[in-house]
Amino acid sequence: MARVKRGNVARKRRNKILRLARGFQGSNGSLFRTANQRVMKALCNAYRDRRRRKRDFRRLWIARINAAARINGVSYSRLIGGLKKADVRINRKMLAQLAVMDPKSFTSVVTSAKS
């Protein structure tokens, strides 16, 4: 069997990793071994944090809605329960936007949930 020289393939693989590691500090962006470790870690963190971001934003929306609801004299859980009973189909993201950008219309939503 003929000998296989891996020059082009190996260089392409290493350059791909070094391209992904561009901007990393020190040897993490310039030496293949350390860059490979940093890139693998970065990709793992990115995968995990894409899922975590969804949770974090939902927590932020709930905190904002709760704060605005308490200003209007109702707790978050009672507000959400009231909205479900009143058949108001508005999600937490939109409620949080209303609470921050347009408090008057948020107050009208709260009054519809109270009744």
UniProtKB/Swiss-Prot annotation:
PROSITE patterns: RIBOSOMAL_L20
Annotated GO biological process: ribosomal large subunit assembly; translation
Gene3D superfamilies for this protein: 6.10.160.10, Ribosomal protein L20 (1.10.1900.20)
GO molecular function terms noted in the UniProt entry: rRNA binding; structural constituent of ribosome
CDD domains xref list: Ribosomal_L20 (cd07026)
GO CC term, one of those recorded: ribonucleoprotein complex
InterPro entries noted in UniProt: Ribosomal_bL20 (IPR005813), RIBOSOMAL_L20_CS (IPR049946), Ribosomal_protein_bL20_C (IPR035566)
Assigned keywords, A-Z: Ribonucleoprotein, Ribosomal protein, RNA-binding, rRNA-binding
Function: Binds directly to 23S ribosomal RNA and is necessary for the in vitro assembly process of the 50S ribosomal subunit. It is not involved in the protein synthesizing functions of that subunit.
Name of the protein in question: Large ribosomal subunit protein bL20
Organism: Prochlorococcus marinus (strain MIT 9313)
